[in-house]
A protein has these predicted regions:
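Long, intrinsically disordered, low-complexity Ser/Thr/Pro-rich regulatory/activation regions
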Residues: 238-259
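An amphipathic, hydrophobic-aromatic interaction surface with interspersed Lys/Arg
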Residues: 1-69, 141-234
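Hydrophobic, aromatic-lined core segments that form the binding pocket/scaffold
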Residues: 79-184
Length: 259
């Protein structure tokens, strides 16, 4: 399922029919003292992306009792994630972190029950089972800016052949520099690096207020700033060399597709 871009950008929990409210965590929740820490967050994300084979390898690596019996064709990813007590509890913790409600395991029906928050009496509002587990995981990853069709930044529209030539020279230089860098030196989309870059160039966000953003909002701001910088460079080329192909509305093009 694809949530609306507007809804994901709002930062509010979003209701998934038959399940509950999914959410993108705020950066506050990832801090080492007041949150779960960045390392734990990465573990949670990795868990959401694991397929059946990854889970089997994890259970065997941890040497959980009974792990060797899970490699059966009749078991899907949800089954492998929940048949062993240790992995089932990890799965519950991970899913709960990206939801507004708490989860309780229902052994009789082999499913997670989604419990209403702040209810006077226990109230089930949804469930996560072997039939909707993949959809829930995919949607949670979307809210963390993973699995979205970003592609490259929208192509810059050149005003004339001269501006195109200058643009290609700049891009060629950047590509050449990137090839010279070692693998360790290549820019990474780590949250720490993105937070630092946004705080350095954004007119409003700084280290005092940026942690109020959700993960989705941070990545969106980062890619928007990157695209705007490309648009600004193209406008500078146009202002110096002119041309009749330049369109001022190019900066309005969305960076996300199919939303």
């Amino acid at each position: 399922m694809r949530f609306d871009y507007f809804d994901m950008l709002s930062g509010d929990p979003i209701y998934l029919q038959g399940v509950g409210h999914l959410r993108s965590p705020s950066l506050h929740e990832l801090r080492p003292t007041s949150g779960i820490g960045y390392r734990a967050y990465n573990i949670y994300l990795n868990f959401l992306t694991w397929d059946k084979e990854h889970l089997l390898k994890y259970d065997q690596l941890m040497q959980y009792r009974g792990a060797h019996r899970l490699n059966r064709k009749c078991f899907n990813t949800f089954d492998v994630a929940t048949l062993l007590t240790q992995t089932r509890e990890l799965c519950r913790v991970v899913l709960s972190f990206f939801m507004l409600e708490d989860l309780v395991w229902d052994e009789a029906h082999r499913r997670y029950l989604v419990m209403a928050q702040d209810a006077e009496e226990p109230c089930v509002i949804g469930e996560i089972n072997r039939d909707n587990f993949d959809e829930v995981r995919e949607t949670m990853l979307q809210l963390n800016f993973i699995g979205l069709d970003k592609g490259d930044a929208p192509p810059v529209q050149h005003s004339d052949d001269k501006s195109k030539e200058l643009w290609e020279k700049v891009q060629g230089h950047l590509k050449e520099q990137a090839q010279k860098e070692s693998k360790e030196d290549k820019p990474e989309y780590h949250l720490s690096n993105i937070i630092s870059k946004i705080c350095a160039v954004h007119p409003s966000y700084n280290l005092l207020n940026i942690y109020g953003l959700t993960v989705f909002q941070l990545y969106d701001a980062f890619f928007q700033v990157s695209y705007m910088r490309s648009s600004d460079l193209n406008e500078q080329i146009f202002s110096n060399h002119g041309g009749d192909k330049f369109k001022f509305e190019n900066w309005l093009k969305p960076i996300l597709k199919n939303l």
